Amino acid sequence: MSNTENNNAKRLPVGKDISTRRRIARARRHDRIRKNLRGTAETPRLVVHRSSRHMHVQVIDDIAGRTLAAASTLEAEVRALEGDKKAKGAKVGQLIAERAQAAGITAIVFDRGGYKYHGRIAALADAAREGGLKF
């Protein structure tokens, strides 16, 4: 066994495929981020969950344990939209901004859920900012 193969064998847990390792790494990142984020009634937490096809966004008051507003790509308004996932993410960002403002929320804390601030996540955040939410 060469040095490179030996190093790779040490790094990869037995029985763990790439998708499992990525899921575990994302969960660790999310835990690390969540240590410093707390949503309140004045500045609730905007949480993003992303799957391969859809996105779900919630505005949560962590102290009361309540969801104040929510939006998803599963809604008919977003499903009817033509375009790629980034366009649908931006539409979800607009929807959550409208619903949050209707609930009297203007400032939020952004919880990206351990995902990179890139692509769909960035499009959603930018659209929410343009919709009037302060991060």
From Swiss-Prot:
MF-aspect GO terms: 5S rRNA binding; structural constituent of ribosome
Identify the domain of life: Bacteria
Q: Which residues form a coiled coil?
A: none
UniProt keywords, alphabetically: Ribonucleoprotein, Ribosomal protein, RNA-binding, rRNA-binding
Q: Which GO terms describe its biological process?
A: translation
Which family does the record assign? Belongs to the universal ribosomal protein uL18 family.
Q: What is this protein called?
A: Large ribosomal subunit protein uL18
Per the UniProt entry, what species is this protein from, by scientific name?
Answer: Corynebacterium diphtheriae (strain ATCC 700971 / NCTC 13129 / Biotype gravis)
Organismal lineage: Bacteria, Bacillati, Actinomycetota, Actinomycetes, Mycobacteriales
